[in-house]
Amino acid sequence: MRIYQCHFCSSPVYPGHGIMFVRNDAKEFRFCRSKCHKNFKQRRNPRKLKWTKAFRKAAGKELAVDSTLTFAQRRNVPVRYNRELVATTLKAMSRIEEIRQKRERAFYKNRMKGNSERDFLRDKKLVETNPELLRLREVEIANRLAKEQAAAEEVSEEESEEEEDMEVDSEEEEEEKLQKQKILLKNKKRNAKKLAF
């Protein structure tokens, strides 16, 4: 199974997908979707559109020059089949992929290294130029504290109401017990009178 690259955005074109345009000089152009095909027909430059891999490589956002990338180049030279050669090639492919991923991660970390410092300096400058932002922050903090206090008061009120309800319930239970005892005493007295006659 051969996976081609989109001529415009460099994304993979799997078998049975995409569009192929063949020019008069027999040059093939494969596109992953109609969006790429339309942009190609409009003669747009892929290096100027931010969503293409060509732009990302030209702008230095992705690893563009590396020895691991040369292995993926297309070679139109047929090689005689050799079982050992195929086995070593498959092993090498997985190893090259691991190395490429490590290098891409290192490249990304190196590219993002100064971002936190730059963000901090930008925020510091913003606060220095607009000191009213700090006052807004103080107002937000005061509002949050007021909300927390109100919530705490509500919780304490609910707890006190529950305690009062429990006290009322306990008083009612005691009254019911007393009534039951009185009824039992009356029944015992009646039974005693009946036995006496």
UniProtKB/Swiss-Prot annotation:
- One Gene Ontology molecular-function label: structural constituent of ribosome
* InterPro entries attached to this UniProt entry: L24e/L24_sf (IPR038630), Ribosomal_eL24 (IPR056366), Ribosomal_eL24-rel_N (IPR000988), Ribosomal_eL24_CS (IPR023442), TRASH_dom (IPR011017)
Q: Which Pfam families match?
A: Ribosomal_L24e (PF01246)
Family matches, as PROSITE patterns: RIBOSOMAL_L24E (PS01073)
Please, one GO biological process term?
assembly of large subunit precursor of preribosome
| A Gene Ontology term for the protein's cellular component | nucleolus
Region called Disordered, residue ranges: 147-180
* Compartments where located: Cytoplasm; Nucleus
What spans are recorded as compositionally biased (Acidic residues)?
Answer: 154-176
Question: Where does the signal sequence lie?
Answer: none
Task: Describe the subunit structure.
Answer: Associated with nucleolar and cytoplasmic pre-60S particles. At the end of biogenesis it dissociates from cytoplasmic pre-60S particles and is likely to be exchanged for its ribosomal homolog, RPL24.
**Per the similarity annotation, which family is this?**
Belongs to the eukaryotic ribosomal protein eL24 family.
Q: State what protein this is by name.
A: Ribosome biogenesis protein RLP24
